[in-house]
Design a protein with these regions (language model features):
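The feature marks the mature, well-folded catalytic cores of soluble enzymes
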Residues: 1-204
Length: 204
């Protein structure tokens, strides 16, 4: 997960092991692609296949995360420039505040029981950013959308967005602080969310 020009996060999970991450980091450092690679050892749990099932970025400062798994007890190792220079962190908060002092960590399910667990299972943390502060989410995760609305985001459906662009009521270049929702009844049958379904090839 590319956080910014300097930082890359990779989750070590049931599907991604530490050896592969360190080999990747070594190649990236030698080619001077990034300055820091952060290895986050996420729980070995079937609901946590990859890092983006627990944590995704929607703006330069805002991230949606699953609080029960990401707040405490994580083993986080950051490699700085090479594999010999390492820094460890006690949790995602400590790590993120160092990278981005203005960070806002927005809880999946609005940190409400039992919605947080249900919505994490339904890809409630899994957003894909179209641009800074404009991201796509499943429409079904209502409490997560509620948390975003409370923090100043407007929620519109993909249909509303497309109609607004077509009629000239919405200028996509000026769009900001917006979550675009898509229906998920068929997509969720195979698992994964909007971030899982995309592969950015070029990012600013």
């Amino acid at each position: 997960m590319v956080i910014d020009r300097k930082n890359l996060f990779i989750g070590s999970s049931l599907r991604t092991n530490k050896y592969s991450i360190e080999k990747t980091a070594d190649i990236l450092f030698k080619q001077k692609v990034v300055e820091r690679v952060t290895l986050i050892e996420i729980p070995k749990h079937p609901n946590c296949i990859h890092l983006d099932t627990l944590f995704t970025q929607i703006s330069k400062t805002d991230f949606v995360y699953y609080q029960p798994f990401m707040s405490t007890g994580l083993k986080i190792t950051q490699y700085r420039g090479d594999l010999d220079h390492q820094v460890t962190y006690s949790g995602i908060h400590q790590l993120m505040y160092e990278i981005q002092p203005m960070v806002r960590l927005i809880p999946c399910g609005n940190a409400k029981y039992p919605y947080a667990e249900r919505e994490q299972y339904a890809s409630g943390c899994n957003f894909v950013a179209l641009k800074n502060s404009v991201a796509v989410s499943y429409a079904r995760n209502l409490k997560t959308l509620e948390a975003l609305k409370e923090r100043g985001y407007q929620i519109i459906s993909a249909g509303e967005l497309l109609n607004g662009i077509k009629t000239g009521l919405i200028d996509p270049e000026k769009l900001q602080d917006t979550i675009v929702t898509v229906r998920s009844s068929e997509l969720t049958r195979a698992g994964g969310g909007p971030h899982c379904l995309t592969l950015p090839l070029v990012r600013e």
